Amino acid sequence: MDTEKMITTPTHWPSPAKLNLFLYITGRRDNGYHELQTLFQFVDFGDELTVTANRETSSITITPEIPGVATEDNLIWKAATALQQHTSTTFGADIQLKKVLPMGGGIGGGSSNAATVLVALNHLWQLNLSDDQLAEIGLKLGADVPVFVRGHAAFAEGVGEQLQPANPDEKWYLVVKPQVSIATVDIFTHSELTRNTPKRALSTLLEQEYVNDCEKIVRMLYPEVDKQLSWLLQYAPSRLTGTGSCVFAEFSSKKEAELVLEQLPDTVSAFVAKGRNISPLKETLAEYQSAHPQSI
């Protein structure tokens, strides 16, 4: 490895949100984990990480600190140190996070941050790990991290670990974040949660109306989510993503989505974004690889 070729200037990487366009719970395993079928799609809106590789030290610095999150619990730090440990590299990095995605919204903010760090540092540290290797590291950090690492919209089965690329329509979305925090465990352990939705082929699911099996329980337990979803449904097909708390409405144009956004009170957190089957992270990586090929 020629460390003189290492890029040590700041590099900028997107950390996009994701939506679960549908989520079906098809069973429960003996260990308590739920079998599911879900469709992940990225959007062109998210956090941004400025990553600067450091060949002089192995330290990982992250700024700013996230209130209430210790460094060792920060998925960005966990991802960087996991990559160091897996490869025994002695390099470090300075990482700046521009946070715009709400935490705990079911849109993958933390998992996306972790994946962006893995992809960025794999390139900057010239490690040459494959997507499969990065996804394996990422899976230990969170169930959704591999989807973000691979960077393609995906149909997931099993407990979410079985992925196959998918190409759903790239619609415009209005995503709304109700001001509540949802405990995923409360949803998946609820006695009234649907757990026996029949498994279906992806081709069949893509032709049917999309549903989230968690939505009924979340709306029942969290009136604020029910309120926002009921409001969105006046304008367009709308659903919960993951176990929430974010909800989204789908539109055929940016203008339609923005017109509805304008009617939301300023106190409501929301954004308009376009569905993307190829992650903005993958596009950025390709640009950096083209400009700085790893010819070592």
UniProtKB/Swiss-Prot annotation:
Its EC number(s): 2.7.1.148
Residues bound to ATP: P102, M103, G104, G105, G106, I107, G108, G109, G110, S111, S112
Catalytic activity: 4-CDP-2-C-methyl-D-erythritol + ATP = 4-CDP-2-C-methyl-D-erythritol 2-phosphate + ADP + H(+)
List of catalytic residues: K18, D144
Keyword terms: ATP-binding, Isoprene biosynthesis, Kinase, Nucleotide-binding, Transferase
A Gene Ontology biological process term: terpenoid biosynthetic process
Superkingdom of origin: Bacteria
InterPro entries assigned: GHMP_kinase_C_dom, GHMP_kinase_C_sf, GHMP_kinase_N_dom, IspE, Ribosomal_Su5_D2-typ_SF, Ribsml_uS5_D2-typ_fold_subgr
Function: Catalyzes the phosphorylation of the position 2 hydroxy group of 4-diphosphocytidyl-2C-methyl-D-erythritol.
Protein name per Swiss-Prot or TrEMBL: 4-diphosphocytidyl-2-C-methyl-D-erythritol kinase
Organism in which the protein naturally occurs: Vibrio atlanticus (strain LGP32) (Vibrio splendidus (strain Mel32))
Lineage: Bacteria, Pseudomonadati, Pseudomonadota, Gammaproteobacteria, Vibrionales
